[in-house]
A protein has these predicted regions:
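Predominantly the C-terminal beta-signal and adjacent terminal strand-loop region
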Residues: 183, 199-252
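Outer-membrane beta-barrel channels and translocator barrels
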Residues: 45, 98-100, 152-156, 197-201, ...
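Residues that define the transmembrane beta-barrel architecture of outer-membrane proteins
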Residues: 46-48, 83-87, 137-143, 157, ...
């Protein structure tokens, strides 16, 4: 229950922030006719343009267990009990394909961490809790490629949605732990945001959801052959996939 409460609280925080961003987009669209001329009326007619972004991201792991039971009757399960925000920074290249379509490439760096808790599922309720924890720090080089689909411009705002893929490479140094993960992964991504046209640049808050496609768990662990207490964690898992929520602020 403690894990569930933490996850629910974290999800509600992310949803609240996304709701605030969408409300800001809606309120900005309610400009009165004749207020003023539009900012940067020809900004979207450029064949290509550059920009950069900063933001936050939340990492999660989806564990699939295989039901493995140790010789002493333990059945270990793992989960991420809560989300810690990480920092991300990217550069942006945007290519105009059509009035409503843009191709965007935004390589960058994601810095973050997540905590994994592993518990013995078979222990009795009145027993002393048997568990292990592992803090995982990650430094990702990311290469997102997105198709941006924009709506009609409403004075100085323009809502949009995105879809694409993102390749990631974890370049941080790793030491031997109970769980080890592959350095490379590929994500499917989808998101939404809104362009705000300011006098000198466009400001775009965006929320993106990223779903990992590959099993990142290292199943072969010869380094733990002499340490069955740590090896049983890997043996208890069929696969592990990554998910992320990314909140980004673009300046173009």
């Amino acid at each position: 229950m403690r894990f569930l409460r933490k996850k629910i609280a974290s999800v509600y925080r992310v949803r609240l922030l996304a709701t605030v961003i969408m409300m800001a987009c809606g309120l900005s669209a309610l400009g009165r006719p004749g207020d003023k001329l539009m900012n940067r009326p020809y900004a979207d007619l450029k064949r290509w343009h550059l920009g950069f972004s900063v933001g936050l991201h939340f990492q999660d792991l989806k564990f699939t267990h295989n039901g493995f039971i140790t010789a002493d009757g333990q059945q270990w399960v793992a989960e991420v009990p809560g989300y810690d925000p990480g920092f991300c920074v990217n550069v942006l290249a945007d290519l105009r394909l059509h009035q409503y379509f843009n191709l965007r490439v935004s390589p960058g760096m994601y810095f973050g961490s997540k905590k994994v808790e592993m518990l013995d599922y078979n222990q009795s309720p009145d027993a002393i809790t048997t568990h292990m924890t592992q803090d995982i720090k990650s430094t990702y080089v990311v290469v997102p490629i997105d198709l941006k689909i924009s709506g009609n411009r409403l004075r100085d705002t323009r809502p949009y949605v995105t879809g694409g893929v993102m390749a990631t490479f974890d370049v941080g140094k790793k030491k031997s732990e109970a769980l080890m993960f592959n350095t490379a992964d590929v994500f499917l991504t989808c998101g939404f945001g809104c362009d705000f046209y300011l006098p000198y640049f466009k400001f775009n808050p965006e929320v993106k959801f990223c779903f990992g496609l590959t099993d990142i768990l290292r199943h072969k662990r010869p380094d733990l052959d002499d340490n069955p207490e740590m090896l049983k964690m890997t043996e208890s898992l069929a696969k592990v996939k990554q998910n992320m929520i990314v909140i980004t602020f673009y300046f173009e």
